[in-house]
Amino acid sequence: MRLTGLLCVALWSASAVVLAEHQPCRPPPQTHGNLWVTAAKGAPASVGEFNYDSQARKLHFKDDALHVNKTDHLEMLIFFEEGIFYDIDSHNQSCHKKTLQSTYHCLEVPPNATHVTEGYLGSEFIGDQGVRMRKWRKRVPELDGVVTVATTSCGCVTLFATLFTDSNDVLVFNFLDVEMKVKNPLEVFVPPSYCDGVALEEEGDTFFGLFH
């Protein structure tokens, strides 16, 4: 752990010398963990498990029914490259295939985002009590709002993100227990068999809109 920390410090120091300004970093190839999404009123909008492949640009998320008190539990499979997503109901074995209206999401830094700041989340001076992070911001016209993403300085793992819209809606995303792998990679990004042959519906949504 100490060696990893020293390596991160060394890499950060070297990059600070070479680069005159921060460029958006790239996330790890694969990540898996838990995602907590909180809406404007403070109640959890969704809590569940996510798997993300940044190279194939595919995301799977499924609500944890034990943590969220609602009747409709979200399960989605998003193909950002293809611009589609599947709204999945595994309980009733039903599936809707819809258009993804925007490819922006918060599991990686948006292209051309502005670097805001760099510092420690927690404490820099107490061992194992802080994480060095970078914060990025970008206005996204198709979302009518501003997306802010905070990542680790070394590794570019998303820690938390926010969407502030012009209509004063707020979504806060917190990423917990993140691992550098995908759970069941041969299955998690494959639509279930009852999605086969489902027609593409005219109705669409965005990554952020799915959590409203």
Swiss-Prot record:
Chief location bin: secreted
Residues annotated as glycosylated: N69, N92, N112
Location(s), subcellular: Secreted
Molecular-function GO term, any one: calcium ion binding
Keywords recorded for this protein, A-Z: Calcium, Disulfide bond, Glycoprotein, Secreted, Signal
Pfam families (alphabetical): Ependymin
Disulfide bonds: none
Signal peptide range: 1-20
SMART domains (UniProt xref): EPEND
GO-annotated biological processes: cell-matrix adhesion
Tissues with expression: EPDs are synthesized in the meninx and secreted in the cerebrospinal fluid.
InterPro entries named in the record: Ependymin (IPR001299), Ependymin_CS (IPR018224)
GO cellular component: extracellular region; lysosome
PTM (free text): Binds calcium through the terminal sialic acids.
Function according to Swiss-Prot or TrEMBL: May play a role in neural plasticity. May be involved during axon regeneration.
Family to which this protein belongs: Belongs to the ependymin family.
Subunit structure comment from the entry: Forms disulfide-linked dimers.
Listed name of the protein: Ependymin
Organism of provenance: Clupea harengus
Organism phylogeny: Eukaryota, Metazoa, Chordata, Craniata, Vertebrata
